[in-house]
């Protein structure tokens, strides 16, 4: 399907202060943009914006960024935000970026993003385009460059072939592990808890299409293999409280993991 160009999109986005025009300049400093040091969640391919705007309103303790590649698509989400703004209901903890997902590492620093949402992404059905799918291992490598060690990727779709492909990619991934999945989200009492539907989700669900969802996380054992095999570390493993690419917070055996510690370490 050919994307319809909307001539006024560029001017509307340019005038909206919530649209970040030079996102690369904020790499590593996104908390300065939001004025609050809070976890950062992003949605890649935010569509009309209902999902992320609802999340932002419900969770003021989290900062959100909606990403779209095309200005004519991002326009719809920005206009929805502006409607809420006119009513005095717009969440303050949301920003928008018009960019290609391939450029994520130039916009976000390592361990700067806590969660990535992928909702009803383009399935790119032709086999030769598999690398373009947002749930391909090519993209999981990019996500690994920006996610915290406890970061997650959440993916929803009604496209079963795409979902099966995504599961297979995770099963062969060297960086992520599959934590949860459902082939019928709306009838899954556990995974559907707190679910916020996108516009597409509501449409496809009303047509009787089951919605699939998976949650994946970084495989920390691959990040610090020595830590998980050293007998002394394993003996005191219950005291290990947090690991990511930059920090290890621990007690009782900080001397043992000194080689892994880089900065801002806190003993519990």
Task: List PLM regions with ranges.
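SAM/dcSAM-binding transferase cores
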Residues: 1-39, 61, 178-268
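Class I SAM-dependent methyltransferase "Motif I" SAM/SAH-binding loop
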Residues: 44-47
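Glycine-rich SAM-binding Motif I of class I
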Residues: 49-53
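Conserved SAM/SAH-binding beta-strand->alpha-helix loop
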Residues: 70
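S-adenosyl-L-methionine
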Residues: 79-110
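A short acidic, Gly/Pro-enriched loop at the edge of an enzyme's catalytic core
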Residues: 106-115, 120
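A short glycine-rich, Lys/Arg-flanked "PGG" loop and its adjoining helix->strand segment in the class I
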Residues: 135-149
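Conserved beta-strand signature within the Rossmann-like core of class I S-adenosyl-L-methionine
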Residues: 150-157
């Amino acid at each position: 399907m050919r994307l319809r160009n909307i001539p006024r999109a560029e001017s509307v986005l340019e005038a909206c202060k919530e649209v970040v025009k030079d996102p690369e300049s904020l790499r590593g400093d996104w908390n300065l943009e939001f004025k609050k040091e809070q976890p950062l969640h992003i949605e890649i391919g935010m569509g009309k914006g209902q999902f992320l705007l609802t999340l932002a309103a419900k969770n003021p303790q989290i900062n959100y960024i909606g990403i779209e590649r095309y200005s004519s698509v991002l326009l719809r989400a920005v206009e929805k935000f502006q409607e809420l703004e006119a009513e005095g209901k717009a969440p303050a903890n949301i920003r928008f970026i018009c960019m290609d997902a391939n450029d994520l590492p130039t916009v976000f620093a390592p361990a700067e993003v806590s969660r990535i949402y992928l909702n009803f992404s383009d399935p790119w059905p032709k086999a030769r385009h598999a690398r373009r799918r947002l749930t391909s291992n090519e993209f999981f490598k990019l996500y690994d460059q920006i996610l915290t060690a406890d970061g997650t990727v959440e993916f929803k779709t009604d496209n079963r072939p795409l979902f099966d492909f995504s599961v297979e990619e995770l099963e062969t991934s060297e960086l992520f592990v599959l934590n949860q999945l459902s082939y019928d989200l709306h009838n899954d009492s556990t995974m559907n808890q707190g679910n916020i539907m996108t516009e597409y989700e509501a449409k496809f669900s009303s047509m009787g299409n089951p919605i699939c969802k998976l949650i994946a996380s970084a495989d920390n054992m691959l990040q610090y293999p020595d830590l998980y095999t050293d007998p002394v570390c394993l003996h005191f493993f219950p005291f290990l409280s947090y690991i990511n690419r930059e920090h290890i917070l621990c007690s009782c055996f900080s001397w043992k993991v000194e080689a892994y510690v880089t900065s801002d370490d806190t003993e519990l």
